[in-house]
């Protein structure tokens, strides 16, 4: 029987920052948040912090976001390794073209034992889940049979790697959209804010909304000055959304 893969989001990389020693400036932050402030101050050479309201890093970054000077957010980035996400969800995810992606290849990785991601609305209903897993099992069985026959048909291909790749790329056509995939996603702070604003909305598909909420939680930990204006709230149906009055790029 098909196994259900739980969503897992792991932060694997984030920006480090080293201030130039010849610039007369310091800040109370580090990493990406410090880089954002440095980039903003570099535009105006305001190293002496003339405005008390923006003297702290948090105050400065909040002002940057409030006035819409979003370009300085593009200097800092975060990378996530995401597993337990369905192929159908990554088809939506990769529409965010300011991100960079590296995704599991079904041409090189066999899917005999692939897990599936149960859609919201099915995952908590035993009868629906049984129908779902039976369909997933049928798809995987068809994949395995096609793969075996295709490899036999391509036996004259002397290059074993090419033979396996050609068989897999044809057989994968019967795998369900719910098949689990794994993907590395890198984006700058501006791109992540846009993603959260678009996909943590109640109007987004629930699977990608869950992904956006989990990414947001880790982004707040990594750079609270940049992401803590988003508020996560629970709706009447028990699902979560995130909104911010400063999220104007949608």
Swiss-Prot record:
Catalytic machinery residues: 199
The reaction(s) this protein catalyses: dUMP + (6R)-5,10-methylene-5,6,7,8-tetrahydrofolate + NADPH + H(+) = dTMP + (6S)-5,6,7,8-tetrahydrofolate + NADP(+)
Renumbered ranges of motif ThyX motif: 95-105
GO biological process: dTMP biosynthetic process; dTTP biosynthetic process; methylation
Keyword Nuclease: no
Pfam families documented for this protein: Thy1 (PF02511)
UniProt cofactor note: Binds 4 FAD per tetramer. Each FAD binding site is formed by three monomers.
Residue numbers binding FAD: 71, 95-97, 103, 188-190, 194
MF-aspect GO terms: flavin adenine dinucleotide binding; NADPH binding; thymidylate synthase (FAD) activity; thymidylate synthase activity
Cofactor(s) required, per the database record: FAD
Keywords: FAD, Flavoprotein, Methyltransferase, NADP, Nucleotide biosynthesis, Transferase
Domain ThyX: 7-233
Enzyme Commission code: 2.1.1.148
Annotated residues for binding of dUMP: 92-95, 103-107, 172, 199
Pathway(s) annotated for this protein in UniProt: Pyrimidine metabolism; dTTP biosynthesis
Listed SUPFAM superfamilies: Thymidylate synthase-complementing protein Thy1 (SSF69796)
Keyword Transferase: yes
Disulfide bonding pattern of the chain: none
Main EC class the enzyme belongs to: transferase
NCBIfam families, per the entry: thyX
HAMAP family the UniProt entry points to: ThyX
Binding partners and assembly: Homotetramer.
Job of this protein: Catalyzes the reductive methylation of 2'-deoxyuridine-5'-monophosphate (dUMP) to 2'-deoxythymidine-5'-monophosphate (dTMP) while utilizing 5,10-methylenetetrahydrofolate (mTHF) as the methyl donor, and NADPH and FADH(2) as the reductant.
Family in the record: Belongs to the thymidylate synthase ThyX family.
Name listed for the protein in its UniProt record: Flavin-dependent thymidylate synthase
